Amino acid sequence: MAAITAALIKQVREETGAGMMDVKKALTEAEGDVARAKEIIRAKGIQAAGKREGRKAQEGTIASTVVESANGQTGYAVELNSETDFVAKTPKFVEFAGSVLDDAVKAEASSVDEVLAAASGDTTVKEAVEEAAALFGEHVKVGQFAKVEGPHVEVYAHKKSAEMPPSIVAMIATDEAGAAVAHEAALQISAMGAQWLTREDVPADVLESERRVATEKTTEELKSKGKPEAVIEKIAPKIVEGRLGAFYKETVLLEQAYVKDPSKTVGDLFKEVGGTALSFARVEVGKGDAE
């Protein structure tokens, strides 16, 4: 029997696209015979997993949880993608997404790369995902990952329909007082898709771009109405600031109108209970990098 070395495993993986554990098993069964191992892999349909990686996987589900931590609580959300919603809603796929989440939590992962590197039984999440592709017959991948920490963390998982798994997960970290309105804030995040917590969190380049667009649009509108340059220079800045204010109300969580009572903002909810929102995250299936 030929020795099953790392180089041999790498060779067969590169030639078949199969996962590491599948290659090890095939080589063991074939007693180190590469040609026979490749036949075993083909027979089991594992090779197809590598070929599927070039196909887009933008359906799927999001597994989420809250665990106790040194800082109080930590919320985790992991998106697992498939090619079709048919696969995404199967109990086995949802169960597998949950196992990936469990592995991420055990590893205290903070990024997609750390999730993929996390231990999963006697292999890694990356290898487990590759093997799942063969099981489900589709390209399967870990998509987005989010993590929030604070004294209190609230998680809300939204389903498009009863038979489908969660397609949006919203998480928010608050202080203890803010916990009283954290659920309402999580609902708001899910429904309205805020991008930043406060206006100070808006990146400078984003704000600069918005200001430039607002200025150009305002100037063109005033010119089209026949306003003289002197008038434009006088009134345009106020109009631009108004448009930036509208931008903040649309994209900044604490400045958004509360969906259940538009007469108040989300920030008002926290003021009413003397609480503070610390951070939040929103993950929606298919909204990460297309692949």
Swiss-Prot record:
CDD domains: UBA_EF-Ts. It is found in: Cytoplasm. Pfam families: EF_TS (PF00889). PROSITE patterns: EF_TS_2. Its main location: cytoplasm. One of its GO terms (cellular component) is cytoplasm. One of its GO terms (molecular function) is translation elongation factor activity. The keyword Protein biosynthesis applies. This is Elongation factor Ts. Keywords: Cytoplasm, Elongation factor, Protein biosynthesis. Belongs to the EF-Ts family. SUPFAM superfamilies: Elongation factor Ts (EF-Ts), dimerisation domain, UBA-like. Associates with the EF-Tu.GDP complex and induces the exchange of GDP to GTP. It remains bound to the aminoacyl-tRNA.EF-Tu.GTP complex up to the GTP hydrolysis stage on the ribosome. The gene is tsf. Residues 84-87 are annotated as: Involved in Mg(2+) ion dislocation from EF-Tu. The lineage of its organism: Bacteria, Bacillati, Actinomycetota, Actinomycetes, Bifidobacteriales.
